[in-house]
Amino acid sequence: MDKYGLVIEERLSSLLEKETENATDYHDFIGRLYGDLREYTFRRGKRLASCSTLLAYKGFNGEVDDRILDVCAGIELYRHSILLHDDLVDDDEERRGGSTIHKKYSHEHDIRFGGGLAVFAGNILYALAVKAFSSSGFESSKIVKVLSLLCAIPQHVAHL
């Protein structure tokens, strides 16, 4: 599993590096936020969802290609968007040994700023996940199915 996790992390790193550069070109503060999101996303986790997806794909297709690596990166971005919002809702101080985004920015600015920024930051990760899925190179009909599932998840959670 570690071998596949590293391959996924390489793709995730490449995607986030490009996005961080673009964000920094736009504004230094936004670039810093993207850097913090990159650090948050790379805190050591199991990457079970993305690794399972990669292994299932390899089992059916016999190989790992760029398309599935983009999808796996999207899965990680999506998962971390949920975790970031969960940290805010639960008012967690730490996630995997590091400060949560809302606490980090609350300490630097104020509570309202940190909380608001965390909502936007989670949404940024969600948007990056959608971008990774959309640009994966899979057929449009498959991408639409995946994006429909992603949109349905928050609705189901809200009904719990």
Indicate where each model-derived feature is located.
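Membrane-interface helix-loop junction between the first two transmembrane segments
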Residues: 21-29
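Mg2+-dependent prenyl diphosphate-binding active-site environment of isoprenoid biosynthetic enzymes
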Residues: 29-160
